[in-house]
UniProtKB/Swiss-Prot annotation:
It comes from the Eukaryota. Glycans are attached at residue 192. One of its GO terms (molecular function) is protein kinase activator activity. This is G-protein coupled receptor family C group 5 member C. It is found in: Cell membrane.
Amino acid sequence: MAIHRTVLMCLGLPLFLLPGARAQEQAPPGCSPDLNPLYYNLCDRSEAWGIILEAVAGAGVVTTFVLTIILVASLPFVQDTKKRSLLGTQVFFLLGTLGLFCLVFACVVKPSFSTCASRRFLFGVLFAICFSCLVAHVLALHFLVRKNHGPRGWVIFLVALLLSLVEVIINTEWLIITLVRGAGTEGDALGNGSAGWVAVSPCAIANADFVMALIYVMLLLLCAFSGAWSALCGRFKRWRKHGVFILLTTTASIAVWVVWIVMYTYGNRQHNSPTWDDPTLAIALATNAWAFVLFYVIPEVSQVTRSSPEQSYQGDLYPTRGVGYETILKEQKGQSMFVENKAFSMDEPASAKRPVSPYSGYNGQLLTSMYQPTEMTLMHKAPSDGAYDVILPRATANSQVTGSANSTLRAEDIYAAQGRQEATLPKEGKNSQVFRNPYVWD
């Protein structure tokens, strides 16, 4: 008997090991034999849809992460305060888009308790976050396009957060009701009338029920779509392009939702292909998330650092007073245009000062006019003085000697000009007015 038992054990041992060996042999091409069968869709080369969606979702995760960093890093460079108030909502939108790309992996992986629960809860919540941000942005655009000033940034973010929390409450209640159901069998067996609770698999749900749980998300999508149309009407046209971005995004989202709902509830069943339910959800997530990135996120990031026309106009009239070397040179150059030569403006009255250079009328012609004494010279001139009168010359329009390249009147030029005039003019009596060098005594 002992020998027979030993023989049976030796023959039965391979039978226990045979299912494991068969499972290892049935691993699809491209997957490791030690890999959990739950993740075969991620590496199965015979069904390439999982690998393609995995690559698309991975690229989306990287792109969304980079755009989030760019948007946050551009905060100090945003000149328009109205655009700065929308940055919080747009970052919240990017986080929702990043979650959609990550949820694609849960739809590619084969159904289990954790994957089905995450699909049912996060599918509606993540889309609700994105569409709530679009609704809040549309609400802000209604004020901006008509009054050129909108609500504060925390108000816009609070609106998006409250709208998305509604879907969180709906999905939480739905999961509690469907996953934990009361069954009176155990309570009746105990005889105390208490109800027992039996856990139900989250995957055991009809496709139509899954779609019906997303009615609130569809309502948010329709609100964003209709609000984008009304945001295109207003006096301030520079805000209309943001409404166009939202309109394109919601239009693409509506098209994606119509297609995947029809395929998920009707098309797959008609073609007897229930195995395409998971690819349908994964394709819908990846397509709509990329629509968010291409039609809304990238255009908004490109517009966030651009200044408003009002700021550009004010910058032309009142340039920013910086501390750079070029700014100092410009200011000195602008001020030097109106600085007088103090040697020739000592006798100017204070009321006659104007921000115009006294040499601005010089035309470069030969000195032909006679120099006239100023008021101060006539007041201090004694009647008996004749040949030794000191006359302070004034700079006039024709106060330059031929060949001089400088517009400033110099004493040497005055002396040379007066010397030529004294040689040509006839000498008169002592009382005659003689124009002499004001700096040299005879």
